[in-house]
Every structure is written in C-alpha cells, then in structure tokens.
Swiss-Prot record:
Family: Belongs to the UPF0178 family.
Lineage top rank: taxon: Bacteria
Family annotation (PANTHER family): UPF0178 PROTEIN YAII
Protein name per Swiss-Prot or TrEMBL: UPF0178 protein Sama_3557
Any Pfam family hit: DUF188
Amino acid sequence: MQIWVDADACPSVIKEVLFRAAERRQITVTLVANQSVRVPPSPFIKSIRVESGFDVADNEIVKRVSKGELVITADIPLADEVIAKGALALNPRGELYTAENVKARLNMRDFMETLRASGIQSGGPAPLSQADRQAFANQLDRWLARLPK
C-alpha cells in the first residue's frame, strides 16, 4: 500500500505533510513528475522522473497504482482514472474524489474550461489556504487510520 503524488503541480506545503506522514507511518510515498523533484533522504520517500509531455506523469501513475492506494492530485481526469482502478484520489485542498462525485467534478471542470476559453471566466483557483492544508491533513489522516498497523 502506498501513496502516489502527481508532483508537478503539488504544492510544497502538501509535499511536506506527505513526507512527515511517510516517516511517521512508514508508508511509501512516490512522487511522479516530468522534472526533478527534491525529496528528503528516506527509505519511504521516492521519486520517479518521466519524460516531458502531455499526461506522461498521469499515465505513469495510472499504470502503477493499485486498488486501495491513494493518489494525491488536483487533476480531475487523473482522479477519474485512478478511481476506475479502485484507488482513491485526494486533492491538495482536502477534497476526496470518489466514484460518486468525480464525474460531477469532471463535468464542472469541463464547463469552467469552456468559460475560460470563451473569455467569460478568467483565472484559476484561489491560493491554498490554511483551512485547505488542514482539510488535506485531516483526509490523509483518515486514510492512514484505515491501514493495518
């Protein structure tokens, strides 16, 4: 059982939470990115560098993830794919994607993308807040608590 991280867009503060959890629970955290990612020396923290390209890191995560594992991503299409494989997906703001809610999130993402492309809506999400960080840590702790000791 391990945690996979879509590391290219994962905020540093969230990575730090994951690194502490990896050490505390002795669970493997693997960061997947198309650029070098600095990780602390630990037998529980790994990184995989993939080639640059559209969805290359996402495809690597989908290929490697197993049922019941956790994927950290803000990428809703990636969340949809890993959920289809029986994994769980958690975004850096603490929202747990499930089979019940991921399709609605995907539809909303596509709608917002259309609005941005037409010039009606601009900008992206607000910066990560302290409440977001706490919500992420709480969801991560809930997932970790379900693991066998």
